[in-house]
From Swiss-Prot:
Protein name, entry field: 7-cyano-7-deazaguanine synthase
Domain of life: Bacteria
Binding-site positions, Zn(2+): C201, C216, C219, C222
SUPFAM superfamilies: Adenine nucleotide alpha hydrolases-like (SSF52402)
Organism the protein comes from: Bradyrhizobium sp. (strain BTAi1 / ATCC BAA-1182)
Binding sites annotated in the UniProt record for ATP: F13, S14, G15, G16, Q17, D18, S19, T20, T21, C22, L23
Amino acid sequence: MSDTHDMTALVLFSGGQDSTTCLAWALDRFARIETIGFDYGQRHAIELDCRARLLDGLAQLRPEWAGKLGDGHTLEIPTLSAISETALTRDVAIEMGADGLPNTFVPGRNLVFLTFAAALAYRRGISHIVGGMCETDYSGYPDCRDETIKALQGALSLGMARPFELHTPLMWLSKAATWQLAYDLGGRDLVDLIRDQSHTCYLGERGARHDWGYGCGACPACDLRARGWHEYIAGSAQS
C-alpha cells in the first residue's frame, strides 16, 4: 500500500463491529476520512442509528481522530431489498439455502455498495475506499472474497478512468483478531466502544446485553461475534 498519510479515504461505515474497526484503522492511516452508509431496507437498520454514537466516541477517544473526521453520507437504495428475498430484508427464519449459502446473503450487495461508494468518491476527489469485507470468518458470501474485491477494483478503475484502491484490512483476520486489531488501534477504550455501541445482530435486537455486546445471541452474526470475543478474551488472559 502506498503512503496514505496525506490522503483522504471513504470508509463504508454501517455501524457494525467490522466497519467501526475499519474506520479506526483508516483514521490511523489517512489524513482525512469521509464515511458512507446504506439504507437498503435491512431488518437490522438499527445499525445505522449506532453510527452517530460511534463517531462521537471515536472523536473523544483521540483528539487527532476528531480532526480527521469529515462528511458522513447515507444513501438509500430500496431497490436492493425489492429484488432480494433474503432473511436480511424479509421477516423470515435464517436458514441455509440449496446452494450452500445462508439466506442472509443479499446477492450483489457489496458490489452495489462499492460501486456507489466509488461513484461518490469520484465526485469527492477520493481514490481510497475502505471496506470491512472478510474471507476468514464469513458465511461463504462470494462478494466478500478477496478475488471479488480485486476484480471490482479493476473494473471500477477502468469504468471511471480513475485508479481506485479498495482497502480491506480485515480480509484475512478472524473475528478474534478483529477484536485484537481494535485493541491495537485504540486500546481498551476502543474495544469497549465497539462492544457497547456497534451493532451486528441480523435481527436488529438491541435489548439484551451480553459480554460481547447487544444482540439476540442466536443468529449467525451474534454467534460469530460472541465466539470471536471469547477467543479474544482467552488470548488476552494468556498474554
